[in-house]
Structures are given as structure tokens and as C-alpha cells.
């Protein structure tokens, strides 16, 4: 059994990091491994380390932990580097969004057709894209045999950028494909009898194959839409897989949008809050409305505070068990949800659903498994350039990643009217980043339906570049 070093960048993300640690503990083939946690927020880093060590102690696993605030330390001697960091955090994203809205760009300039996800900035996110490249180059220099696992948004732009510019082993991961299981559950189907396949780009994947008991399962979905869709109500802002927006997109494109693809629709569904409510449901109007995103940010803030609270309690009460947290927490909904998450990771028979650790296990121990991965196209999806990263199912084993044949192929409408326009925006973002040509960002905004004048474009870009966090970005774009 190989013991490996796994580095996690942005380890202050509480739930994600704990899920990875729990999956490691439930993977015998990775016993004895070292996990290096890296974050620039030392308080959050210490909290995660405290809880992770308690978890490992409680389940009796053989894992070693290191912590660092230095990027080199997390990469040196690493076999796998998982990046989930967001440079500037949500504070920076909100600053840019507010500037955009000040000049008439509802939900900010990075909210673009087919890319409406509120933390998926591509044009004003120079610092994030540069960080991806910096990490990749350090891997090339310090641990050239290591795998780079991209988990931080924007995964589409980020993984494409890294695979084009730095010769390392890189793959991107998301969990939007689990939207298929939501459909399966809603239709009352037995999961083991479902044959499914998705294909597209990150946050732009489509259910090209949907079969049940050997037959086409789409008529079952059509029946549900006809008989039950009118009664659909969202349970939370992210609950949109069977929303009116998803169904409307399905009717136009011919196959079902999956996961965050539903959020990444056209302006028809996103013009304003009332429009969002119509298509994504009351009361939030989806995850990316001003109401839905505030719900998400508030939830994140509560999770961070709960994590610190739990870590403090563990330090003060070393004999406490994580399974007893319900007696400490559980006072409000967020704390109850945190307790439920802990109960899930304590279940020895249950993996988290994150793909990263099973992927590592498949590569190292030849435990063959199916994953949905973000990798360069290389002919997988017809009509898309080879060096564009696509999101597709693949078998992974000790010999690497083996993408499935996309069968049946994606409909022409998906490729021509959805994927190619989305890819064009990715290409514009990457060319702007790589060349420093500010005219590309201006051109994007000239085409934006929210733009009413050239002056509007000049002013919004000028104010975004003037942010203190964007000093390097400003120099990069104004050097020409």
C-alpha cells in the first residue's frame, strides 16, 4: 500500500477538507499517508486541523497531518495537490459585483450568458487565474511527477489554462453530475438500473444518455414534467435541477441540463430578480439572485463560525467525541446541518461523494472506477477543439484516465448554440489574461445587453482596476 503526500490548498474550507479527510480514512489503500493543509487564514486552518486530528483519532486511522501557510511547503514532495482556494475570498467578489451593479451590470460584469454562477468570475479574476498558473509552475519545478487536482472555480477556465501552459498532470473536478441522481430519485427509478452519461464543459453538462432497464428513460421524465412539474417548489436556492428553467432548456436543446448548467442559462432567465423567481422558484429566484446568494454567503459564514466553535470545544475538552457534538451544537438550523455532516463522515460505510480521494485510490491502487472529469477534449466531443477542457465520464485505473465514448453524441443545438458560445467567452477570458489586452474585456462588455454606452464600459473597468487588490492586474492590463 503506497503512502502518499496529499496537499490541500485552501484547506480552511471546512466541510470540503473534512470530507477529504474522512474519505482518506475510509480508503485502506492510502493508509499511512500525509495530508498537508495550507491556508492563509491561520485561525481557520488551526480549526480544521484540530477537527481533522480528532476525527482520525476517533476512527483509528493512520494519517499524518502537517499545516502550513506557505505554498512551497504544500507542494514539495507532494504526490497530489488539490486546489480549492479562492484568492480574495467572497469579499473581493462582492466588491467587484457592487462596482458592476453601480454601472448598470446586474449581478456584476462576470455574470455572462451561459456563466451566471456567482463565484465563477473569469474576466475580473486575474488574481485567481494567476494563482492557478503559479501553483502549476511550482508543481512543475518542485514536484514534477505530482498530479494537480483543480477544485477551485473557475474550473473550466482554470483547467484549460493550466493544461495549455504548464506541462504537468492536471485534472478538474466538480460535482454537478450528481444532478442526474436527483432526477433518478424524483422519478422513483432504481439507480442500479439506470444507464446515464453526461458531456459538455464544466457547469455546462448535458444528459446525452438516459436509459432505464435498457430502454429510453426520457419519456419517464416527460411524463413527470406533464403531470407533476407544476407542483415543483425549491427546498433551497440551489434546488433547481427540475425547475422551470431546467425544463425550458430541455425543451429547446433536446436533452436535460445537469447540475450547475441549469444556473448557467441565457439572459432570458436572469434579467432581474422577478425573472429569476419565475424560472428558479420563490422565494429566492435561484442561487445566483441577490437573495439566493446572500442565503449562501450567510450559510458559509455560519459554517466558519461553527467550525471555530467546535475546534475550541475540542481543545478545551480533549476527551469529547465528534459523535457527541449534537449535545454541544444543534441549537439552530446551521448547527444541526453541521452535526448531520459530521454524522455522515463518521459513517464507516459512506463516502462523501467528492471524487478526489477515490480518484487517487484508482490511480495508485488500480481500484478501477468511473468518474466525471475535466480533461482536454482531444476528440472526445465532436465539434470542439482538442485543447478545450471538457467534462466527461471516464474510467480511471493505474494506467490513467480513459474517457468514455460519448454515445449518443450531444445534439447539434447543444454544441453549436450553448457550448461554442460558452467556449468563446472562455477563450476571450484566457486571451485577455495571457496577453494583457484590455480591449478583449471591453469587447465582451460592448456586446453585453446591459451596456448602453462606451463610457459605461470605460468607467466600470477603470473602477475595478482601481481596487487595491487589483494592483498587479492593473499593471498587467495597462502596460500596453
Curated annotation (Swiss-Prot):
Protein name, per record: Alpha-glucosidase
pH dependence: Optimum pH is 7.5. Active from pH 6.5 to 9.
Binding-site list for substrate: 119, 153
Gene that specifies this protein: aglA
Source organism of this protein record: Thermotoga maritima (strain ATCC 43589 / DSM 3109 / JCM 10099 / NBRC 100826 / MSB8)
UniProt keyword terms in alphabetical order: Carbohydrate metabolism, Cobalt, Glycosidase, Hydrolase, Manganese, Metal-binding, NAD, Nickel
Cofactor(s) needed by this chain: NAD(+); Mn(2+); Co(2+); Ni(2+)
Function: Alpha-glycosidase with a very broad specificity. Hydrolyzes maltose and other small maltooligosaccharides but is inactive against the polymeric substrate starch. Does not cleave beta-glycosidic bonds.
EC numbers: 3.2.1.20
Reaction catalyzed: Hydrolysis of terminal, non-reducing (1->4)-linked alpha-D-glucose residues with release of alpha-D-glucose
Temperature dependence as stated in the record: Optimum temperature is 90 degrees Celsius. Active from 60 to 105 degrees Celsius. Highly thermostable.
GO BP term (any one): carbohydrate metabolic process
Keyword set includes Cytoplasm: no
Transmembrane intervals: none
Pfam families: Glyco_hydro_4 (PF02056), Glyco_hydro_4C (PF11975)
One of the record's GO cellular component terms: cytosol
Amino acid at each position: 500500500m503506497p503512502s502518499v503526500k496529499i496537499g490541500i490548498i485552501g484547506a480552511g474550507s471546512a466541510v470540503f477538507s473534512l470530507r477529504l479527510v474522512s474519505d482518506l480514512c475510509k480508503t485502506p489503500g492510502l493508509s499511512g499517508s500525509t495530508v498537508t493543509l495550507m491556508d492563509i487564514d491561520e485561525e481557520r486552518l488551526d480549526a480544521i486541523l484540530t477537527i481533522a486530528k480528532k476525527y482520525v483519532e476517533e476512527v483509528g486511522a493512520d494519517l499524518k497531518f502537517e499545516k502550513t501557510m506557505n505554498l512551497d511547503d504544500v507542494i514539495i514532495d507532494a504526490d497530489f495537490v488539490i486546489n480549492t482556494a479562492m484568492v480574495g475570498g467572497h469579499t473581493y467578489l462582492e466588491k467587484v459585483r457592487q462596482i458592476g451593479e453601480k454601472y448598470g451590470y446586474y449581478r456584476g460584469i462576470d455574470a455572462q450568458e451561459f456563466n451566471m454562477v456567482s463565484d465563477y468570475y473569469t474576466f475580473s479574476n486575474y488574481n485567481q487565474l494567476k494563482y492557478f498558473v503559479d501553483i502549476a509552475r511550482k508543481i512543475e519545478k518542485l514536484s514534477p511527477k505530482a498530479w494537480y487536482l483543480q477544485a477551485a472555480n473557475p474550473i473550466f477556465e482554470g483547467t484549460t489554462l493550466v493544461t495549455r501552459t504548464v506541462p504537468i498532470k492536471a485534472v478538474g473536478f466538480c460535482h454537478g453530475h450528481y444532478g442526474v441522481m436527483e432526477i433518478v430519485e424524483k422519478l422513483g427509478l432504481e439507480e442500479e438500473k439506470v444507464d446515464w452519461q453526461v458531456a459538455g464543459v464544466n457547469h455546462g453538462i448535458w444528459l446525452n444518455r438516459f436509459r432505464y432497464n435498457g430502454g429510453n428513460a426520457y419519456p419517464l421524465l416527460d411524463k413527470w414534467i406533464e403531470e407533476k412539474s407544476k407542483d415543483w417548489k425549491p427546498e433551497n436556492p440551489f434546488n433547481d435541477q427540475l425547475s422551470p428553467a431546467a425544463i425550458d432548456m430541455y425543451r429547446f436543446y433536446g436533452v436535460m441540463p445537469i447540475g450547475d448548467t441549469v444556473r448557467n442559462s441565457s439572459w432570458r432567465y436572469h434579467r432581474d430578480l422577478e425573472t429569476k423567481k419565475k424560472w428558479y422558484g420563490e422565494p429566492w429566484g435561484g442561487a445566483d439572485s441577490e437573495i439566493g446568494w446572500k442565503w449562501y454567503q450567510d450559510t458559509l459564514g455560519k459554517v466558519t463560525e461553527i467550525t471555530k466553535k467546535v475546534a475550541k470545544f475540542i481543545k478545551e475538552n480533549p476527551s469529547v467525541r465528534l459523535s457527541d457534538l449534537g449535545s454541544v451544537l444543534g441549537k439552530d438550523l446551521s448547527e444541526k446541518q453541521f452535526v448531520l455532516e459530521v454524522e455522515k463522515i463518521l459513517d464507516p460505510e459512506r463516502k462523501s461523494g467528492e471524487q478526489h480521494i477515490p480518484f487517487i485510490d484508482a490511480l495508485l491502487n488500480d481500484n478501477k472506477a468511473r468518474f466525471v472529469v475535466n480533461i482536454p477534449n482531444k476528440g472526445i466531443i465532436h465539434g470542439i477543439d482538442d485543447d478545450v477542457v471538457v467534462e466527461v465520464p471516464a474510467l480511471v485505473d493505474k494506467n490513467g484516465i480513459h474517457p468514455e465514448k460519448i454515445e449518443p453524441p450531444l445534439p447539434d443545438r447543444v454544441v453549436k448554440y450553448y457550448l461554442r458560445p460558452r467556449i468563446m467567452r472562455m477563450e476571450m477570458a484566457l486571451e485577455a489574461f495571457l496577453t494583457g489586452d484590455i480591449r478583449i474585456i471591453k469587447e465582451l462588455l460592448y456586446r453585453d445587453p446591459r451596456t448602453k454606452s462606451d463610457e459605461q464600459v470605460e468607467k466600470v473597468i477603470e473602477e475595478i482596476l482601481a481596487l487595491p487588490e487589483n494592483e498587479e492586474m492593473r499593471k498587467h492590463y495597462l502596460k500596453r
